[in-house]
C-alpha cells in the first residue's frame, strides 16, 4: 500500500498477482501470441489496472502507438480494479509473439 498517494499498476489477471513487465523508462510490455489468416485481424488483449495507493487516481489512460484502448473506468479508488481492452490491427500472415508497448498515465488531482 502506498500511503498518501495514488499508485496504479497493470496486471495480467483479475487477481492482480502478476504485474506486467516494464522497461527502465516505465513503459509496459504486453506479449501476445498471434496467428492471422484473414486480410486484417483485430487482436484484443484484456489487462487489469489496480490502484495500490490510498488516494484516488484520476484520468487513468494508456498511451501507445497503433493501438485502440477501451477502459472500463477513468478513475480508480484505493484498491479498486478495472479492466482495460487493448486492440491492435494484425496484418495477414503475421505469426509468432507480438509485443505491445504502452505507457500508463494518471493524475492524483481531479
Q: How should these model regions be labeled?
A:
Residues 5-52, 73:
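Beta-sheet-dominated interaction scaffolds and their linkers
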Residues 68-95:
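Intrinsically disordered, low-complexity Pro/Gly/Ser/Thr-rich segments with frequent PxxP/GP/PP motifs
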Amino acid at each position: 500500500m502506498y500511503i498518501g498517494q495514488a499508485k496504479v499498476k497493470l496486471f495480467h489477471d483479475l487477481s492482480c498477482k502478476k504485474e506486467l513487465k516494464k522497461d527502465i523508462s516505465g513503459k509496459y510490455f504486453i506479449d501476445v501470441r498471434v496467428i492471422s489468416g484473414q486480410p486484417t485481424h483485430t487482436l484484443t488483449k484484456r489487462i487489469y489496472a489496480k490502484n495500490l495507493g490510498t488516494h484516488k487516481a484520476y484520468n487513468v489512460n494508456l498511451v501507445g502507438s497503433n493501438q485502440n484502448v477501451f477502459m472500463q473506468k477513468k478513475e480508480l479508488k484505493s484498491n479498486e480494479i478495472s479492466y482495460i481492452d487493448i486492440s491492435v490491427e494484425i496484418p495477414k500472415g503475421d505469426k509468432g509473439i507480438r509485443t505491445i508497448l504502452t505507457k500508463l498515465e494518471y493524475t492524483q488531482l481531479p
